[in-house]
Amino acid sequence: SVAVAEAFRDHFGFTDSPPEKRVERWRQWRTSEMWDDDLVWLAEDETGIVGINVCLREHGAKVDQGYVASLGVLPPRRGIGLARCLLLTSFAEYQQRGKASVSLHVDADSITGATRLYTGVGMHDVETEIDFELEIRAGKDIVVR
Protein backbone atom coordinates (compact mmCIF):
# COMPACT_ATOMS: atom_id res chain seq x y z
CA SER A 1 0.00 0.00 0.00
CA VAL A 2 1.02 3.61 -0.44
CA ALA A 3 0.78 4.15 3.32
CA VAL A 4 3.28 1.38 4.02
CA ALA A 5 5.76 2.77 1.49
CA GLU A 6 5.42 6.29 2.91
CA ALA A 7 5.84 5.07 6.50
CA PHE A 8 9.19 3.52 5.56
CA ARG A 9 10.49 6.18 3.17
CA ASP A 10 12.96 7.50 5.80
CA HIS A 11 13.98 4.00 6.91
CA PHE A 12 17.57 2.87 6.37
CA GLY A 13 17.98 1.16 3.01
CA PHE A 14 14.54 2.16 1.69
CA THR A 15 14.19 2.02 -2.07
CA ASP A 16 10.91 2.88 -3.70
CA SER A 17 9.32 0.39 -6.02
CA PRO A 18 6.40 0.49 -8.44
CA PRO A 19 2.98 -0.39 -6.99
CA GLU A 20 2.88 -3.71 -8.86
CA LYS A 21 6.15 -4.78 -7.18
CA ARG A 22 4.73 -3.85 -3.76
CA VAL A 23 1.61 -5.90 -4.47
CA GLU A 24 3.76 -8.87 -5.48
CA ARG A 25 5.78 -8.59 -2.25
CA TRP A 26 2.54 -8.59 -0.22
CA ARG A 27 1.33 -11.67 -2.08
CA GLN A 28 4.56 -13.47 -1.24
CA TRP A 29 4.27 -12.51 2.43
CA ARG A 30 0.63 -13.55 2.60
CA THR A 31 1.41 -17.01 1.24
CA SER A 32 4.19 -17.57 3.78
CA GLU A 33 3.50 -20.18 6.45
CA MET A 34 4.38 -17.53 9.05
CA TRP A 35 1.57 -15.20 7.85
CA ASP A 36 -1.62 -14.79 9.87
CA ASP A 37 -4.27 -12.20 8.93
CA ASP A 38 -5.06 -11.81 12.63
CA LEU A 39 -1.54 -10.50 13.23
CA VAL A 40 -1.96 -7.40 11.05
CA TRP A 41 -3.23 -4.15 12.55
CA LEU A 42 -3.99 -0.85 10.85
CA ALA A 43 -4.37 2.63 12.32
CA GLU A 44 -6.74 4.80 10.30
CA ASP A 45 -8.07 8.32 10.38
CA GLU A 46 -10.28 10.33 8.03
CA THR A 47 -7.49 10.34 5.41
CA GLY A 48 -7.06 6.56 5.34
CA ILE A 49 -4.37 4.23 6.66
CA VAL A 50 -1.79 6.10 8.76
CA GLY A 51 -0.07 3.22 10.56
CA ILE A 52 0.50 -0.50 10.22
CA ASN A 53 1.86 -3.36 12.30
CA VAL A 54 2.53 -6.62 10.46
CA CYS A 55 3.56 -9.48 12.70
CA LEU A 56 4.41 -13.10 11.99
CA ARG A 57 3.37 -16.23 13.88
CA GLU A 58 6.88 -16.84 15.11
CA HIS A 59 10.48 -15.78 14.67
CA GLY A 60 12.04 -18.44 12.47
CA ALA A 61 12.83 -21.54 14.51
CA LYS A 62 11.88 -19.78 17.76
CA VAL A 63 8.32 -21.10 17.94
CA ASP A 64 7.73 -19.57 21.39
CA GLN A 65 8.62 -16.08 20.12
CA GLY A 66 6.40 -13.74 18.12
CA TYR A 67 7.95 -11.44 15.53
CA VAL A 68 7.10 -7.84 14.64
CA ALA A 69 8.03 -7.79 10.95
CA SER A 70 6.97 -4.29 9.99
CA LEU A 71 5.77 -1.43 12.19
CA GLY A 72 5.35 2.00 10.64
CA VAL A 73 3.41 5.24 11.00
CA LEU A 74 3.16 8.01 8.43
CA PRO A 75 5.44 10.95 9.34
CA PRO A 76 2.60 13.47 9.93
CA ARG A 77 1.02 11.09 12.47
CA ARG A 78 4.16 10.19 14.41
CA GLY A 79 4.59 11.21 18.02
CA ILE A 80 0.97 10.75 19.12
CA GLY A 81 1.25 7.15 20.33
CA LEU A 82 0.00 5.21 17.29
CA ALA A 83 3.09 3.00 16.99
CA ARG A 84 3.00 2.31 20.73
CA CYS A 85 -0.66 1.35 20.54
CA LEU A 86 -0.08 -0.93 17.54
CA LEU A 87 2.90 -2.55 19.25
CA LEU A 88 1.14 -3.12 22.58
CA THR A 89 -1.82 -4.62 20.73
CA SER A 90 0.48 -7.18 19.14
CA PHE A 91 2.07 -7.96 22.52
CA ALA A 92 -1.36 -8.69 23.98
CA GLU A 93 -2.22 -10.97 21.06
CA TYR A 94 1.04 -12.89 21.40
CA GLN A 95 0.44 -13.27 25.13
CA GLN A 96 -3.03 -14.69 24.38
CA ARG A 97 -1.37 -17.16 22.02
CA GLY A 98 1.05 -18.30 24.73
CA LYS A 99 4.23 -16.82 23.28
CA ALA A 100 7.09 -16.35 25.74
CA SER A 101 8.54 -13.27 24.04
CA VAL A 102 8.36 -10.94 21.05
CA SER A 103 11.26 -9.73 18.93
CA LEU A 104 11.96 -7.35 16.08
CA HIS A 105 14.86 -5.85 14.19
CA VAL A 106 15.47 -2.11 14.14
CA ASP A 107 17.89 0.39 12.66
CA ALA A 108 19.53 1.64 15.85
CA ASP A 109 20.27 4.96 14.16
CA SER A 110 16.71 5.48 12.96
CA ILE A 111 15.70 9.13 12.78
CA THR A 112 12.17 8.14 13.82
CA GLY A 113 13.05 7.45 17.46
CA ALA A 114 12.20 3.77 17.06
CA THR A 115 14.66 2.58 19.70
CA ARG A 116 13.06 4.93 22.28
CA LEU A 117 9.67 3.44 21.42
CA TYR A 118 10.90 -0.12 21.89
CA THR A 119 12.75 0.50 25.16
CA GLY A 120 9.74 2.53 26.34
CA VAL A 121 7.50 -0.54 26.08
CA GLY A 122 10.00 -2.73 27.93
CA MET A 123 11.99 -4.26 25.09
CA HIS A 124 15.77 -4.48 25.35
CA ASP A 125 18.73 -4.99 23.05
CA VAL A 126 19.74 -8.65 22.86
CA GLU A 127 21.99 -8.47 19.82
CA THR A 128 23.68 -5.67 17.93
CA GLU A 129 24.65 -6.11 14.31
CA ILE A 130 26.74 -3.88 12.12
CA ASP A 131 26.19 -4.19 8.39
CA PHE A 132 28.48 -2.77 5.77
CA GLU A 133 26.96 -1.85 2.46
CA LEU A 134 27.93 -0.30 -0.83
CA GLU A 135 25.09 1.15 -2.84
CA ILE A 136 25.42 0.46 -6.55
CA ARG A 137 23.01 2.05 -8.98
CA ALA A 138 22.74 1.43 -12.71
CA GLY A 139 24.71 3.95 -14.72
CA LYS A 140 27.00 5.02 -11.90
CA ASP A 141 30.58 3.84 -12.36
CA ILE A 142 32.20 3.61 -8.92
CA VAL A 143 35.34 1.75 -9.94
CA VAL A 144 38.60 3.63 -9.50
CA ARG A 145 40.77 2.89 -12.51
What are these regions (language model features)?
Residues A43, R77, G81-T89:
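Conserved acetyl-CoA pyrophosphate-binding loop and the N-cap/start of the following alpha-helix
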Residues F12-L71:
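A conserved beta-strand-loop-helix scaffold within acyl/acetyltransferase catalytic domains
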Residues S1-K21, V144-R145:
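Short amphipathic alpha-helix that is part of the acyltransferase structural core
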Residues I80, R84, D109-E127, K140:
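Conserved active-site alpha-helix within GNAT-family acetyltransferase domains
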Residues P75, L104-A114, F132-R137:
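Conserved beta-strand-loop-alpha-helix junction that forms the acyl-donor binding cleft
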Residues R78, L87, V102-H105, Y118:
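Hydrophobic multi-pass inner-membrane translocation pores used for secretion
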Residues Q65, Y94-V106:
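Conserved GNAT acetyl-CoA-binding A-motif
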